[in-house]
Amino acid sequence: IKYKYTLLANSYLKVNKINHNIETKELDLINLNGTNANCDFILKNISIGNDTIDVIINHNIRETTSNIKCDGLSVNKGTLNLNVTTIIPNGCVRAKANQDNEIISMNELNNTIKPLLLIEEYDVEASHSAKIGSFNEDDLFYLKSRGIEEKEAKRLLINSFLKRNLDDCEIKKYIDELEVKYEQRRF
């Protein structure tokens, strides 16, 4: 699957995306082609197969902004390979680029995050982060100490992880529907 977004001057794009297919191979290509083009891209990926997601953000002109937030949940036999690349060529002054990537693994399989900042300009603000792990044992212990069984505690943590950074009620509703669908499965 390939998605291409092109933003011109003074435009704004907000993408809230949820994937939960068995095998996902996806490319999201974002071209910021006009001054003051701004993009907020939020991806939630539930991996139950071998998933590969590539996100490429091209800051093709000065004074552009991208905020990329990719969250993955690896369950059952699922793996996630997440590649996020931001490109800021020379001359694209005052560009702002942020990447925040996290995968929560509910299995023992390998997941990868490759955050790349390819920057040829000095006058920019850019940051990236990548985290792969499981839920914090202290959080799980706290919920269990309050009488919540482990399965329910994990369900609450998964729900919170998938809904964070989302402000669209329809997407939150969709996650609730997914939760019902997967309720019979063991995470």
What are these regions (language model features)?
Residues I1-I148, F161-R164, E170-F187:
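Conserved beta-strand/loop scaffold segments within soluble protein domains that form the structured core
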